Amino acid sequence: MAISKIAFLALIALSGLCGLASATYKVGVGRADITGPPVEINFMGYANIKQVGRGIHTRVFARAFVVEDEKGNRVAFVSADAGMMGYGLKREVIKRLQARYGNLYHTDNVAISGTHTHGAPGGFLMHLLYDISILGFVPQTFEVMAQGLYLCIKRATDNLVDGRIFLSKTTVLNVNINRSPTSYLRNPEEERAQYEHDTDKTLTQLRFVDLENNLLGAFNWYAVHATSMNNTNRLVTSDNVGYAALLLEKEYNPNKMPGKGKFVGAFCSSNLGDVSPNIMGPKCSISGNECDLLTSRCPAGEGECFASGPGRDMVESTQILGQRLADAALGLLNEQSQESTAREVTGDVRFIHQFVDMPNYNGSAYNPLSRKIDKIRGCQPAMGYSFAAGTTDGPGAFSFEQGTTTDNPMWNFVRDFIATPTQEDIKCHEPKPILLATGRATFPYEWQPKIVSDQLLKIGDVIIAAVPCEFTTMAGRRLRNQIRAAASAAGGLDTEVIIAGLTNIYTSYTVTPEEYQAQRYEAASTIFGPHTHSIYMDVFERLTKALMRNETVEPGPSPPYMNDVMLSLNTGVLFDGHPINTDFGYVKTQPEKEYGINDTVKVTYISGNPRNNLFTEKTYFTVERKINEDRWKVAYTDASWETKMIWHRTNTILGFSDLEIYWNISPQTLPGVYRIRHSGEYKYILGGKYPYEGLSHSFTVKED
C-alpha cells in the first residue's frame, strides 16, 4: 500500500513537471488565394501611375493561424501578400466571420498584416492618398481580398487540433540593408552600441505542431521590404518574402501545386521601415557611382539613384533573397527533433485592442533630444517634401530630395490648392515642411487615417505587437524593449515580443524622434509629427500593462465608415473580340517541338480580358505532363515561380487581346511530353460572360 501511494504521488509530481514543460493549445492554420485583377489595375506600393498590371508571375495568398487556450481564449493572425492592410477591409472580414461564427472573432482578437509586396493590385485601402495612384477604389480587388482573408481564417478554424507551439530564432545575413543609414546614425551612440547592425537580422519563427509532433505550419517574422521587384515590374508577384513562403510550403507539401497542401508557411513583416532588400546599395543608374548619402540624388547626367539586389536582374534578386530566407526557416524546422534552438511556448492566450485618435492624443514622454520629460501631442496627418523624393528602392518624381527641411513657394501653392495646413499644423510638424496637408483634405473623402488601430496578441510568453504602419529599425527596437519591460513589471518574465508591421490599418511610417530631424523619406512619411513614436510607446506600454493584468481598456473611437463614398476612375471590361477566322483560345504561337533544361517555352493565345474571371483558387493555365495515352498531370500553374503570363491589348476599339504564357524549364523538370492549356472567359458585346479554352500542341522536354 505504501509503495502504491509513493508511486501515485510520483506520477502526480511527474505530471506536474510535464505540465510545466509543455502546453496544449488548439491550433489551426489556413491559406487562401487573394490575387486581384492582374491586368489594367495599378499596383499598390510605389505609387507609380505607370505601374499597371499586365499579368501574373506568382499568385498572392493570405495565410492564417488560430490559437485557442484551455479556457477558450482565441486569437487569429493573418499574413497577407499585400502592400498593407486597410481597416475597411478588416471590418468586412470581421463581418463575414461573425456571420458564420457569431462573436467568436472580432476586432480585438483578429490581426491582419501585410507582407508589403509592391507587386499586387491596389484599390482596397479606402483612403484617397493610398488609392489615388490606383485611380481610386477597385471593388474587384476589395472583394477577392475580403473573401480570401475570411477564408484563410475559416480554414484555420476548421483545421483546429490539439497541438503545441515552439519559438525559435536565427540570424540571417545578406538579406537586408538600411536604406537611410544617415538617419539611423542620429540615434544616440550608446543606444546604437547595443546592436551589431543597423538593421535587425533576426528571423523569429513560431512553429505549430500537433500532439504527434506533425508539422502544421510555421510563421516567420523578418524585417525587410518586399521591394526586390522594382517599379518597372508589371506582373503580380509576392516578391522575396512571398517566394520564401512558396519554397517553404513546397518543402512540406510535396507533389502539391503552389497554394495547395496542409502545411502553411508564412514570412511576415516586422519593423522594416528603413530596411531594403537591395543589398548592393544605391548607385547612380548611368554612371554607376554612389549616390549622395544625405539626399539620395545623383549629379546631373549620372541618372537616378537606384539600389539593386544581388542578382543579375530584379527577378533573380527576388529568387536569391527568398531562397536565403527559406533556408533560414528550414534550418530551424529541421532542428525540431533536437529542439536545440526552440523553446516551447507556454501560458494563456489574451488580446487587447484600442483605437487611438492620434491628432488629439496628449501625453508625456521622455525626450531623447532634450533628455527631459516633455508633453507630447499628435499632429493632423501630413506628408513632407521628402515623401515625394521616394526611396532608393523606388525614386520619386520631379526634383524632390530626401532630407529636405525647407519649403518651396511653388509647391506650397500647389499644396494649398488641395488643402491648406494651419499655422498650428506647420508648427506641430517641424522640422518637416508640409507638402500634403492630408489631415485637412476631405474631398472626396478622408485622405489618410486619423484614428489608428493598436493591438497586442499574447500567446503564452509571446506578445505580438500589431502596429498600423512601418516602424524603422530603431523605432521597432525601442518598442520591443518598452513592451518587454512593461510585461516584466506586470509579472511576465522572459516575454518574447514580435512586431507585426502594416497591420489592421495603414498610416505610412514611424521613425524615432532623432530620425525625424533628418527628414528623409521615412521621417517625411511619419504622418502624425515628431511625437508619433513617443505616442506609440506610451499607448503600447499602457496596453501591455492592462493585458498582463487582465484589465480592459476603453475601445476608443472607431474609424469612419466610408464604403458608401468610394470613387473610382477605373472602368470595367466593355467587351472582348477576336480576329476573323480565329476564336477565343486559338493558339497564335505554338511551342517548338523540343526543349532542353533552362530553355523557355512560349505559347500565345487569343484571349479575353483576365478581369472577366480572376480564377480565384484556380489558374489561368496549366503546364501538363503526359503520364500515358489517356492521362495528363498538371505540373505547373500560374502560381508557379517557373511560369509567367503576360496579357496584351492588341486592338482597343475591337477588344482584341493576346495572352502569352512562358514556362522556364528548371533543372528539376522531369523529361517527357508536355502541353499548355489556357482557360479564360470572354465578355460578349451584347452582354454575358462565357468560358473558353485553348490547348497547345504537345512538345518534348529532353533529358539534360
Curated annotation (Swiss-Prot):
It catalyses: an N-acylsphing-4-enine + H2O = sphing-4-enine + a fatty acid. It is found in: Secreted. It comes from the Eukaryota. Gene3D superfamilies: Neutral/alkaline non-lysosomal ceramidase, C-terminal domain. Disulfide bonds: none annotated. Keywords: Glycoprotein, Hydrolase, Lipid metabolism, Secreted, Signal, Sphingolipid metabolism. Its EC number is 3.5.1.23. GO terms for molecular function: N-acylsphingosine amidohydrolase activity. One of its GO terms (cellular component) is membrane. Pfam families: Ceramidase_alk, Ceramidse_alk_C. Glycans are attached at N230, N362, N550, N598. Belongs to the neutral ceramidase family. Hydrolyzes the sphingolipid ceramide into sphingosine and free fatty acid at an optimal pH of 6.5-7.5. Acts as a key regulator of sphingolipid signaling metabolites by generating sphingosine at the cell surface. This is Neutral ceramidase. The gene is CDase.
